[in-house]
Swiss-Prot record:
Enzyme Commission (EC) number: 1.11.1.5
Record's protein name: Cytochrome c peroxidase, mitochondrial
Annotated InterPro entries: Ccp1-like, Haem_peroxidase, Haem_peroxidase_sf, Peroxidase_I, Peroxidases_AS
MF terms (GO), sorted A to Z: cytochrome-c peroxidase activity; heme binding; metal ion binding
Keyword Mitochondrion: yes
Amino acid sequence: MSTTFGNVFRRVNVKTLSFIVGAGALAGSATGTVMEYQDMRNYNNRNYNKQKLAALAAAHVAAKEKYDVAKYQKVYNDIALKIRDEDEYDDFIGYGPVLVRLAWHCAGTWDAKDNTGGPYGGTYRFAMETNDPSNNGLQNAAKFLEPIHEKYPWLSHGDLYSLAGVTAIQEMQGPTIPWRSGRVDQPEDTTPENGRLPDASKDAKYVRCFFHRLNFEDRQVVALLGAHALGKTHLKNSGFEGPWGAATNIFTNEFYNNLLNEKWDLITNDAGNKQYVNDKGWMMLPTDMALVQDPKYLPIVKEFANDQDTFFKEFTKAFVVLLENGIDFPQENKPIKFKTLDAQDL
């Protein structure tokens, strides 16, 4: 990875960044009962639909594709260059963080019980998912990607959203994320009901229960939450306000160090929601603080705080799983490792 972030976000103001998993903090895994499974739903989302889920379904089969690194590197480069060129977005935040949030929210609707929702079908493009209150603010990310899809109309929306997230992470000095193509756009009636994205106001029990639906274990959960090193929450989008730290446009293990080393006070924000703040103007969500309040999560937080390389390794594995949940990839669809713009001297 390049160590020169300035080439990508040349005029970023690191004090006014915004972002990623925002309203829906990532949560954790557990071997829960059916009642626990139901309780992980985001009942604070007023559009939550209590319709019953179908029986367990087989994995979606990805479209078979010839291994072609150059083909997708061109798409990666166009996304990365657009991020670089349009860096004025949101007070010079740039689009990187919100693209990661889009990839996560598209994948985060997956349900292991019946293989509905998730990263395969690109259903964010339909009104019901676009207008899910948990997706407030992601419309800007989707609009940003429209010219990319117009240039590459053969690219499915599921591939576009996931590839954009990978691109953003790598261009923000994060780890190299192996990515596979072959997701297939599905019809509107396959759009998951609102309410599948997480409620950031909850505790560790909720976190585990939520990520049980996504088949994640504790270590993967803590790794995924490390993406909160990026950007900030917005009151108008998520009901929470503030950045998680200082270096909000660089992918690091800062999130864990801030959890452990800062003094956090619980307040009620202007939206009436509880959040933690410190004297530097940073914040933590209740689901973030759950990681240091839980005796099983805490040792993992300490490990990642002390070893960024280990965090990158674990995050990479977990993020790949997130983007591939419920998908059966043919052998021909081999993982692609993209070069950053800096690595290509672009």
